Amino acid sequence: MTISPQPSHQQFESYQWTTESRSSQQRHGTGTPSQDGRLSAIPDPVERHVARWRSESRNSNKDKVFRNDEEFSQQDEIVNGTLTALKNDVEQTTEIIRRKQEQMRMERRQFQTEMEVNGRISIDPTDDWLAARLKAVSSDDMNQQLVKLKQDQRQNAVTDTLAALVYDVNATTEVLRRGQRGRDGEDGNKKKKEEIEYTLRLTPAPEEQIPQRPKIPEDDNMETDDYSRQYGVQMSEETDSLRRRRARSTTPRRTLHISGSPPPPAAAVCAYCSEEIDGAILTALAPNSERAQKFHTYHFMCTYCQKALNMHGTYREHDLKPYCHDCFYKLYNGLQYAPDDHQASIEKLI
């Protein structure tokens, strides 16, 4: 006869039922003699072990957390989602880094192709060079020199570009400043024409010795009629008292002389563009005119070739028209003269 093993919880229930039945029989005093003998035959360590086992099972049941299948599935989904998101982020970051490296490699390759060095080197034939020129120069040395030149150009590329930009900005600023100063100069000239300048002169000068005026006695017998007859001024009692007080004053008199300054000369006007000349003025015979006029240095030109004549000390004149030396000898050299179409078109433009 075989006995199948029982689960642990069934064994626990059987032990618990046996112990409870025994305790109830002892309390009520019932039971067979065989049972009493059997109870008395059970040793105390067994009960002790059973009680300890029961207490341990209770503590383990308190700490045990029961979870169903749904909770396990939700936890698996959360873990799987987190791992999937981390995997996607790592793949995207790797792709971005790869693209950046590819772009940098392409830019470096493009920069190297654009920074090719072409030039000429001149060497003075000194004794040291003559002694060292027989040495063999390998291709590696030349490549090293070229690489060094390219690196220097690559390092100084930004600096040279910024320097060129600064130079262009400064040049543009200078041009604008000159233009603004020219407009302000025109307005200033107009204002100066409207203003009048006065010069004050004090006489006598402070450093000169002031002569003492003779004292007039108070009992002056000169009548008001005498003043009126001598100076042509109608005298009254108030003017007579004022004259007497002024006569008693010893303060020297000073006279203010106001003399108007001459107006500023008119600004020179170019005979070619009819604008005021600010700067160097060129005075020469105007085309089709019998008197000299003023020009900008770049507006006095040859009638034929339309080149400025400001760089030449002299020029040639024919039929009241200025010519440079080359055009004059080409057209009017005395051997043959035939005005061409180019000169006719220039005259039409003039």
Swiss-Prot record:
Domain LIM zinc-binding spans what residues? 268-334
For this UniProt record, the keywords arranged alphabetically read as follows: Cell junction, Cell membrane, Coiled coil, Cytoplasm, LIM domain, Membrane, Metal-binding, Nucleus, Ubl conjugation, Zinc
| Residue ranges of coiled coil | 83-110
Q: How does it sit in the membrane?
A: Peripheral membrane protein
Compositional bias of type Polar residues: which residue ranges?
Answer: 1-37
UniProt entry tagged with the keyword Hydrolase: no
On whether Metal-binding is a keyword of this UniProt record, the answer is yes
* Tissue expression: Expressed in the body wall muscles, vulval muscles and the anal muscles. Expressed in the muscle arms of the head muscle cells that form neuromuscular junctions and in the anal depressor muscle.
Q: Which residues form the signal peptide?
A: none
Reproduce the UniProt comment on modification after translation: Ubiquitinated. Ubiquitination by rnf-5 leads to dissociation from muscle dense bodies during molting and is required for ecdysis.
The effect of disrupting this gene, in the record's words, is: RNAi-mediated knockdown leads to disorganized actin-containing I band filaments, disorganized dense bodies in the muscles and reduced motility.
Give the protein's function. Answer: Required for the assembly and integrity of muscle dense bodies, which establish the adhesion sites of the muscle cells to the extracellular matrix. Decreased localization of unc-95 to dense bodies and their subsequent dissociation plays an important role in ecdysis during molting. Involved in the organization of the muscle sarcomeric structure and thereby required for locomotion.
Per UniProt, subcellular location reads as: Cytoplasm; Nucleus; Cell membrane; Cytoplasm, Myofibril, Sarcomere, M line
Q: What is the lineage of its organism?
A: Eukaryota, Metazoa, Ecdysozoa, Nematoda, Chromadorea
Name of this protein: LIM domain-containing protein unc-95
